[in-house]
């Protein structure tokens, strides 16, 4: 019986792939796992395992895709996104760049936990001038009222819209489109989890149409200097989380482990605790890049406020949260270790 179900799913996916209606855009669906590919024993329970359903099954569950695009599915990895790695990011980058001329757009199915990070990495590194859309789900594929099928349909619709490429890499979920730089996951369980806290969504999806209302002025994809096509690894950058009563053990551990850069998830306007400050000051003097960010979800970490960044050789992250500041610092360090040049990158991207 299991074999029969598998054959039916593959056949349905093949039918979707074989759609040949005149003028349909060619979309490659790159699957990485996540809740959208999750499976649970109960349709109403909360327990499930991420990354269990293949990309062929995901596509087969939405036969309506054949009406809007020619779909080519590809399984890149099969993981929960809490286990995302730099290696997977580099693999996705390579795959899209290599396949760019073959397709009109790309959809990446992905777990929501680190989706914003993958989106931002690709937003900074892709050389492809085609729409790239990430999508996931907050309920597993076996869940009652699963949001994955509708989200996948909307993501393909978004990738098929040529104007999407002008936005850089985007996330399309819950009928809205948000750009990779500004998006963040805001809720642990609700379907409407993705928001762009500082600047809001860039588009909406309604009645089979994607409408864009705004556009980020930040440079992205082919406009950036961060070409990682020949890299096999990225610089090591860690995050230090500041809180009341924090000690310097974590910061010192990153220094001792010879990390290339450290991002401080500071309080307020990226402020550093007195237990951490001297460690990071010394680290910056010894050539370790230090970026100040904030654990506060909105607002900017501004230069030379309570902390004289120029005096200590620190970089301020602007509106980037700590996890995205880490990514930009990783990429910046592939080009330079000069804190002033790194600051320019944070001001531009």
What spans do the regions from the language model cover?
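Short acidic, glycine-rich surface-loop motifs adjacent to enzyme active sites
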Residues: 100-115, 257-269
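A glycine- and small-aliphatic-rich helix-loop capping segment at beta-alpha/alpha-beta transitions
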Residues: 43-52, 120-133, 148-154, 185-191, ...
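ATP/NTP phosphate-donor binding region
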Residues: 22-97, 278
């Amino acid at each position: 019986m299991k074999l029969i179900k598998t054959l039916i799913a593959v056949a349905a996916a093949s039918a979707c792939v074989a759609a040949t209606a005149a003028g349909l855009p060619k979309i490659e669906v790159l699957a990485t796992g996540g809740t959208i590919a999750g499976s649970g024993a109960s349709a109403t329970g909360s327990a499930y395992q991420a990354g269990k359903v293949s990309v062929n099954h995901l596509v087969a569950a939405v036969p309506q895709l054949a009406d809007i695009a020619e779909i080519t599915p590809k399984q890149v990895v099969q993981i929960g996104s809490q286990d995302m790695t730099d290696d997977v990011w580099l693999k996705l980058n390579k795959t899209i760049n290599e396949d760019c001329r073959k397709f009109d757009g790309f959809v990446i199915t992905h777990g929501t936990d680190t989706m914003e990070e993958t989106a931002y990495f690709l937003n900074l590194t892709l050389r492809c001038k085609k729409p790239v859309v990430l999508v996931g789900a907050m309920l597993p594929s076996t869940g009652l009222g699963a949001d994955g099928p509708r989200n996948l349909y909307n993501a393909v619709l978004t990738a098929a819209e040529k104007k999407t490429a002008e936005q850089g890499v985007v996330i399309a979920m819950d009928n809205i489109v948000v750009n990779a730089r500004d998006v963040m996951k805001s809720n642990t369980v609700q379907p409407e989890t993705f928001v762009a806290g500082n600047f809001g969504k860039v588009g909406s999806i309604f009645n089979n149409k994607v409408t864009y209302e705004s556009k980020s002025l930040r440079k992205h994809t082919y406009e950036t200097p961060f070409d990682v096509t020949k890299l096999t690894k990225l610089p090591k950058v860690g995050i230090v989380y500041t809180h009341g009563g924090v000690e310097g053990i974590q910061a010192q551990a990153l220094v001792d482990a010879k990390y290339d850069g450290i991002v401080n998830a500071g309080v307020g306007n990226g402020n550093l605790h007195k237990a951490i400050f001297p460690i990071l000051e010394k680290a910056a003097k010894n050539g370790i890049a230090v970026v100040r960010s904030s654990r506060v979800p909105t607002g900017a970490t501004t230069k030379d406020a309570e902390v004289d960044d120029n005096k200590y050789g620190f970089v301020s992250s602007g509106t980037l949260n700590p996890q995205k500041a880490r990514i930009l610092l990783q990429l910046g360090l592939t080009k330079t270790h000069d804190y002033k040049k790194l600051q320019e990158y944070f001001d531009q991207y």
